[in-house]
Amino acid sequence: MIKQTYKKWIAACTVTSSLLLGACTSTPPSVRDVSIVPLPNNVQQDSSAFILPKSCTIGITDSRLAPAAEYLAGILSPSTGYNIKVQDGEGTITLSLGEVEGKEGAYQLKTDTKKINIKGNSYGGVIAGIESLRQLFPPQIESKQIVDGVDWAIPSVGINDAPHFAWRGIMLDVSRHFYSKDEVKELLDVMALYKMNKFHWHLTDDQGWRIEIKKYPLLTEKGAWRKFNSHDKECIRQSKVNDNPDMAIPESKIRIVEGDTLYGGYYTQEDIKEVIAYAKVRGIDIVPEIDMLGHMLAAISNYEGVSCFDETGWGTTFSSPVCPGKDSAIEFCKNVYSELIELFPYKYVHIGGDEVEKTNWKKCPDCQKRMRDNKLKTEEELQSWFIHDMEKFFNDKGKEMIGWDEIIEGGLSKTATVMWWRSWAKNAPSKTTGQGNPIIFTPNGQFYLDYQEDKNSVANIYNYDPMSEIQNAEMQPLVLGVQGNVWCEWIPSRERMQYMAIPRLLAIAELGWSNPSQKDWNAFARRLANQFERLNIMNINYRIPDLEGFNKTNAFIGEGIVNITCLDPSAEIHYTTDGSVPTLQSPKYDGPVKVTETTDFTFRTFRPNGKPGDITTTRFIKSEYTPAVTAAPSNPGLKATWHEFKGNKCTEIEKAPVNGNYSIEDVMIPKKVKGNIGLIIKGYINAPQDDIYTFALLSDDGSTLVIDGEQVIDNDGPHGPREVVGQKALAKGYHPIEIRYFDQNGGQLKMKVSGNDGKEIPFTHLYAH
C-alpha cells in the first residue's frame, strides 16, 4: 500500500521556469484549475467539488456502454480501493448516449457535488468524456495500488467538447524491432488517455514479418526471425557507449536456434484479436499495414514466385520488390490480405506503397509484358496498376485503402486515402485533395517520432497548421486528421519507444482534438507540465523535456550566470564540470550558478524513481568582443557553392565536384539546388553593435557555422531536423562567416540571428560578400 497525499507532488516542483509557476500551487484540489490534455472546447467551473464516495456506482443507460463502464471502473478502483459496481440506469457516475453537438466523438461532462454525468454522441464520445474525467482526478488515480491519504476530489465542471479532426493517430513499426502485445496495449492506454483514436499497426517490413498468416507459415517461422542486423548492432553499441540500457536488445526477443542468435517475434491471430478487442474498449480503431510492393524482403525471401527473380536483396536504394507482372505474386498478396481482412474489423487497410525499388521491373519480362498488355508507359504506372487492382480487391471485401503518398505518382484512384509523409513533396496535399481524395497528415519533419527530439520539437508539432498545406480552402474538409509515426530501426525496447514518442504524442493529440482558435503554446506548456506526474505513476518512460536557459555554447563578458529551467516539475538535475557523467551523487542544481572563467558543464536529469535521463553538455566561454575586419564587401547576401556531395561530414564537402555558384540573400538552400547537396556558404556578417550574438542553426541533415575562423556551431552528421544554438561576442562591423551543409533527403537549412536583447535581427543588410 502506498502512503502519500495528493499535495505531496507539489514538493517535486524543484526546478521550473516562471512560465510554470501556475502548475505548482498548494490550492486545494476542489478549486484547482482544470488542466486537461487535449484542451476541451468549453469548460465552466465553479468553486464546489465532487468527492468520489466509497459507495460509487457507474450507471449505463445503453447496454452498448457496458465496456466503457467497466473500463472506467478499472481506472477508479485500484488506487481508491473502492469496489465500484456497474449497473443499469443511473449511478453516481452515469454514462449515456445522445445528441451532442459536434463531430463524432463529441461529449458533455457535468459534475456537481453528488453526481457525474457523461453523455456522448457515440461510444467514442463517452470514452473521450471518461478520459477528461480521469484527468480531473489527482494523478494518483493512475496507481495500480491503493493510495492512502488522497482526497479523491474533482472540481464541479460543465464541459462541452468535440474533436477538431476525426483522425488522431499513432503508427508503431513492429517490424524493425518487435513489441509484445502487452507493450502495444500499454501504448494504447496512453493513446486513450489523450483521446487518440487510430492505431496504425505497421506489421511487416524487410526486417521482420510479425503477423501469423496460416496459408503461409514460413512468413513467421522464418520471416519473423533474423540474425542481428546493422540496426541491432548500432543499438547495442549505443547502449554500451552511452550507458543506456534502453538501447539494449531485450532478452525476451532473442532465441538461440542451432547455435545462431536470432532476434524477433510475431503475433498469433489470437494475439491480434486480443489487441483489437482491447483497443475497441478504449475507442481506438486499428489500421493494419502490410507494406507492398516494396519493403517485402521478409516475404519474398521465403516464397517463390513473389519477386521478379530468384536472387533477392537490395537494389540501389531499397529492397527487391514484389513482382506485379507475375499472377502468382498478386495471388500471394491477395491471400495474405484475405486473412488480414478477416481479423481486422475497421473499414481501412493500409497497403504501404512507399519506397519501391523499380529497377528489377525494367528488366523483368513479366513486368514488361504486364505493361504492354495494359498499355502502361512507365514503371510508376505499373505500380499504380497494382495499387488499383488491390484496391478493387479491398473494396469487394468491404474495405477502403490507405497508402503512403507515393501512390499518387502513377495516378490516384477516386476512392483511395493518402497518408502524406514526404514533407519535401509539397504539392502532394493539394494534388490529393484537388482530385477529391481524403488525406491524413504525417509529414516527417514534425511527425516522425523516431527523429531525435529537441527543445523545439513539441512546439513545432503544437504550432503546425495542416490547413496551410491546402491551397484551395474548399478542399480542407478532405483533411481527415494527423498522425505521429514511430519508426523503430533505432528503437529496440519498450522503454526507448515510449521515450521517443512521449511527450510529442500529447502535442499531436491536442493538435488533432482541440479548436485551433484556442491555440496558446504557453498555456499548453503549463498543462503538459501537469501531465508528467500522472505519466510517472503510470510507469511511462517519457522523455524529460530539454533543459532550457542556455545554448550549446554561451558567451559572457566579465561574469556569467547559469540559470537552468525544466518543463517537468518532477525532474531532478545534477551536474559536473570535469567532463564526467553526472550521477545522483553529483552536485544537485537548485538555483543559478555564477561563472567567472570558461567552464564546461554536463547536466543530467533524473526521474522521481532515480532513472537517469539525457546528458546535456554546454560550454560557458569567457569572452571579449572579437574585432571586426577591415573588409568592405560590395554585394549584399552570401555566396553559396554547390558540390555534388554524397558524404556525411561537412569537412569533406569541398572534395566533391562543384555543380554551381549562387548568390543568396539569407542562409538557405538555393532554389535550383537539388539531388546530392553539399553547400559551402561564405561571406560576412555585419554586427550592428558590440554585442553577444546568438545563432540558431537548423538543418536536416548536417551543418556547421564558423565565424572569424572559430567554430560556433557543430550540427554535423546525418540527422533529422535539428537546431543547435551558439553564441559569440562580436565587435561592431564585418566578420567572416562560413556555413557548411549537406543533405541526405532532408532539405532544410536556415539560421536565425539575435542580439543580447533576444530580438531576432532581419537578414536584410545582415550579410554581404
State the predicted function of each range.
Residues 8, 12, 59, 515, ...:
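Short, compositionally stereotyped local motifs that mark structural "simplifiers"
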Residues 401-406, 411-416, 422-563:
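Flexible, acidic glycine-rich loops studded with aromatic residues
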Residues 738-747, 753:
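Short beta-strand-plus-loop segments that form exposed binding edges in beta-rich domains
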Residues 299-304, 310-415, 422-436:
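Active-site neighborhood of glycoside hydrolase catalytic domains
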Residues 102-104, 108-321, 326-330, 338-348, ...:
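Feature activates predominantly on carbohydrate-active enzymes
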Residues 21-23:
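C-terminal motif of bacterial Sec signal peptides marking the signal peptidase cleavage site
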Residues 25-165, 496, 512-523, 530-534, ...:
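Contiguous, structured surface segment used for ligand recognition
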Residues 11-15, 19:
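Hydrophobic helical h-region of N-terminal Sec-dependent signal peptides
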